Amino acid sequence: KSMALWFALDRWEDMKSHIDGEYDYMIINRYVLSNAVYQSIRDIDLQRPDIIDWVFDLEYGHFCLPRADIYLFYDVAPAQAGENVMKKGFRDYVGGEKKDVYEESCGIQQRARAKYLETAQRRGDVAVIQCMGDEGMRSIEDIGAETMRVLRERNMI
């Protein structure tokens, strides 16, 4: 739980200057759902009860972070995700390495994907965008069109 708290505090620090209603839309990468999923699949916590609901209560209830209207989970096969990471440019938070500690482990990637899909089944605010087709990654245009379709279906745009 301590890792979840650190991520929540970091997010709270970044968001405390946000004024509700200031923008029509806010698109945030790796928000509360990401913290909840990754904390729930850590090796050390696999035998403990799922902490996803605890993380949501911490970030939304205690820190009063703005609630996401929708979470978009872009579903990519872990092997393809690993290939995509290798194409990224320099990222200072990985200290010059190509992958961070979570990206390095195929097991973590597989558990995270499974937990995102499970969570999408349990919660109405998570939409799964399929990024893989029969022949690998779908095109950016196809993925973008599906994203727009999901947002329209949910009256987000």
Model-derived features: where do they sit?
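NTP-dependent small-molecule kinase module
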Residues: 79-157
